[in-house]
Amino acid sequence: MYTFPKNFVWGAATSGPQSEGNFKKRHQNVFDYWYTKDPSAFYASVGPDTTSNFYNDYENDLKLMHQAGIKALRTSIQWSRLIADFETCEVDQKGADFYSRVIDAMLANGITPYINLCHFDMPVELQHKYGGFESKH
């Protein structure tokens, strides 16, 4: 039987679009937009209105992860939640507060956060206006 080294880190991974959905966001990302155009492209037509409900249940979810021995969680921050105005880069304080509470809850449960700033979820406004990452704007 294989045994893991004592310093092996058991972790989990998700992304903002997968776990938070579009609850209480000012903007759509490309996944939110895609779902409005073609819900049948998503498994069982489950889209950003449903997701795993982490946005509302993160405190309990993180407690369960702690109880399961999870020591690290990789997730992403959705620009469509964090940024209020994409031209001025004004931060959406409610979005920033949400991510702050999530990170605090991770740390309180002994879970090291690994944060990804882009999980293929560009705000659709930037995609439409500038053509996405190909733009030099």
Label each residue range with its predicted role.
Residues 1-67:
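N-terminal carbohydrate-binding accessory modules
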Residues 23, 62-137:
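Substrate-binding cleft and catalytic face of glycoside hydrolase catalytic domains
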